[in-house]
Amino acid sequence: MFLDRDGVLNRTTVRGDTPYPPNTLAEVEILPGVPDALDALRARGLPLIVVTNQPDVARGTQTREVVEQINQFLMRRLHIDAVYACYHDNGDDCACRKPKPGMLMRAADEHGIDLSRSFMVGDRWGDVAAGAAAGCETILVNMPYSQCHRCSPDHKVADLREAADVILRRLDESSLP
């Protein structure tokens, strides 16, 4: 399964209508319920893959080193199997930046994941669009900045705990892994 990072696993700082990732490792705050939700998903044998846009690197307001420190911390702390990060900005026209499905496709190829039997959990419309384009069942963690009008998720939830409940229920209903 695929997860966005900021706003799903860790707290964002919202200024105006825009969420911002932590600036330093010291600012990383794992959201309540995340470890237990991931443990429940892992117990069902789901690979936990993070796919995250980190455009502040291209914008020069963040270093790749700090982003990778945060990613490594989350991998260790939350037992994430892999993190795929896009460091491009909106205008770079890369294949990896969500809403394009490039990171999901690459991860699926590298980890032998059947996208049609996968889930994408994110807090913004681009996460949902990327998941849908890749053929995943999509779950939106509905936040004030999510821009829901720009996407049609399969499910809307309040947080990752609720997303895990939806996924576990769907697995039980459909005999997926």
What are these regions (language model features)?
Residues 28, 61, 118-119:
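Residue-level marker of alpha-helix boundaries and capping positions
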Residues 11-13, 87, 142:
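Residue-level signal for short segments within beta-strands and strand-turn junctions
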Residues 65-82, 91-120, 124-177:
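Asp-based, Mg2+/Mn2+-dependent phosphohydrolase catalytic module
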Residues 34-71, 80-92, 131:
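Substrate-recognition element of Asp-dependent hydrolases with the DxDx(T/V) motif
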Residues 18-21, 56-60, 90-94, 147-150:
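A short acidic, helix-capping loop that chelates divalent metal ions and anchors anionic groups
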Residues 1-49:
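Active-site neighborhood of HAD-like aspartate-dependent phosphohydrolases
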Residues 12, 60, 166:
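Residues that scaffold the ATP/ADP-binding catalytic core of kinase and kinase-like folds
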